[in-house]
């Protein structure tokens, strides 16, 4: 059993696994002053929109949007064996992840299902040497920063606490907020606020930076398909940072509604909808999260079950659908080929960028080829649909020159 604690010093064994009452975010008052419409989501009161979902969606695609994602769980796993222990639970290569680099990964169940998807960063600190003492610079204690889904964080913490060894420590960074600055002008705006900090950063780089008295972790990543940054900040400074960023002409606050339509266009799955404990990484088209060497060698929870799917092929696959007309297909809509049901929609909506309905669905593997003509049932009507490659809108991550 892993040693674990929250930043305030509480042992996580005393934490409630589920939150019955709706919580508020550190920026709750800030959102309300900005005119946000607040709704319950993942146990928190969160802004679904400010000016309007389509306006905010298009602004993010054209300029830069600021999202409050403080509901998500920020965790730190530390200890000499941290990478080894995480590799028992995650199918990606953690030990080879270089300091300052981030990787998308999956928390796996023994059944081969997905307990959650997450981002993991090698946060091992560099300790500067001291010429007077004759000490050389060196890497400190191994540390891995993880961002998990808000609705699953308590389950994730319990799972990690149960399966990680006593030699590592799990810390829940409850006293930190998380802001995401996304869009083609995100770097321009952030560079104006924090000069020379992000100049050399590419997609999935992560740095620690003291902005005055604010200790920040800045990671070049996001959930929109655009270039952008996720900024972990002490909760007490979150409002001041949000004000500084929104003072830039390119930046506006953006709500959950646009976040969902942006990630749908980007072909990014939403946990609890497009991926669940009942879906495996192969069927979910997340094979890239299974590092080749670890896919072959195993040693991680769920490997045997996933290996069988890899060998036999998945029964269904997650695909994109472009739907004719203007009527969006929502989660649960059935997919047909003639009279035969061949799938089900897991996410769907109207794409402001493409100006047409799009969806993600699981369909029978034999019908998962790009260009396959299908039908989706919406309000008792069959709408023509075509299997499409994802992302629907090309990603614009900054990968360097």
Role assignments for model-derived ranges:
Residues 80-116, 186-214:
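Internal amphipathic helical hairpin motif
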Residues 119-120:
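Glycine-rich, Trp-frequent "lid" loop and neighboring beta-strands that shape
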Residues 73, 77, 115, 144-151:
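Short coil/turn segments at secondary-structure boundaries
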Residues 2-105, 113, 124, 257:
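Acidic, proline/glycine-enriched N-terminal capping motif
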Residues 2, 7-40, 47-48, 123-401:
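Conserved, structured C-terminal
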